[in-house]
Amino acid sequence: MDERVKEAIFRQVGKEPFAKKFGLQLVELGAGYSKVEMTFTPDMENLFGMAHGGALFALIDEAFETASNSHGTLAVALNLNTTYVSSPAPGSRLTAEAREFSRTNKTANYDIRVTDDKGTLIASCQALVYRKGSPLPFL
């Protein structure tokens, strides 16, 4: 992976308002791979006291966004198909890992899995991006 791209993505995530709001932390980044973490806090609960799907989706999307843009080419989401498997315990540290499993000049596909700090599968997602062909604007 190009170190300039890696540094730029880490820098952008560090100042992204949405990532700050949810406490999303980019911890690993490689070509077609990303690991993002967050802590499940009480303000992320739904009306049943469980993890809100939107909070989990935010974690998934951040891993997807960073993995799909790791090649230095601007990539935007086309489709995400998410399955929520279980609800994490309050205070759990959650990890989303996005792995690229196919890429062409125009599209790329990713498998994203969310686990808690005990290794329990919380959610899984298959996602598709459109690769615009232009470099990342913040390089």
List the model feature ranges, each with a label.
Residues 1-139:
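Terminal targeting signals and extreme-terminal segments of soluble enzymes
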